[in-house]
């Protein structure tokens, strides 16, 4: 089960610098300092999404990201079940739509290549007690 399969929202293509500044992600190198550099992944997800239709609409970057994870599992002969967290029914439906996205080998290679250049640490760095509340008290 992949942890945070949509990169805390980054791979949805909806995360902005402003949203990062207002969240706990502001202290994370992958999201704040390297936002622009890591956008190449989102750009590629969007480009691949343009080649797929889900429920009569162009696929979303999130759907492609989830399909990419599942297909990586197939490559290694492992069952992969991404479980993205969400609080909105629309996102649950969107995420389920990823099952209709069947990526080609060429699309997988494109996504694999661009992901090799992601910058910044993936996990949170704990810098003291304030990381939990992000100074919201």
Where are these regions (language model features)?
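Eukaryotic N-terminal low-complexity, Ser/Thr- and Lys/Arg-rich leader segments
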Residues: 133-137
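Short Lys/Arg-rich basic patches
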Residues: 22-30
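Cytosolic histidine kinase catalytic core of two-component systems
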Residues: 40, 105-106
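Conserved short secondary-structure transition element at the edge of the structured enzyme core
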Residues: 5, 33-100
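Tryptophan-centric aromatic hotspots in well-structured domains and transmembrane helices
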Residues: 3-4, 68, 115-117, 121
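Short coil/turn segments at secondary-structure boundaries
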Residues: 124-129
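Aromatic-lined glycan-binding groove of carbohydrate-active enzymes
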Residues: 1-23, 60
């Amino acid at each position: 089960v992949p942890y945070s399969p949509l990169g805390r929202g980054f791979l949805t293509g909806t995360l902005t610098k402003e949203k990062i500044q207002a969240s706990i992600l502001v202290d994370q190198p992958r999201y704040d300092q390297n936002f622009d550099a890591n956008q190449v992944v989102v750009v590629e997800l969007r480009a691949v999404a343009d080649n797929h239709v889900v429920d009569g609409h162009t696929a979303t970057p999130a759907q492609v990201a989830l399909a990419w994870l599942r297909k990586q599992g197939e490559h290694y002969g492992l069952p992969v079940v991404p479980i993205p967290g969400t609080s909105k029914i629309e996102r649950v439906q969107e995420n389920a739509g990823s099952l209709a996205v069947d990526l080609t080998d060429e699309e997988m290679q494109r996504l694999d290549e661009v992901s090799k250049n992601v910058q910044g640490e993936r996990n949170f760095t704990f810098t003291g007690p304030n990381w939990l509340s992000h100074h919201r008290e």
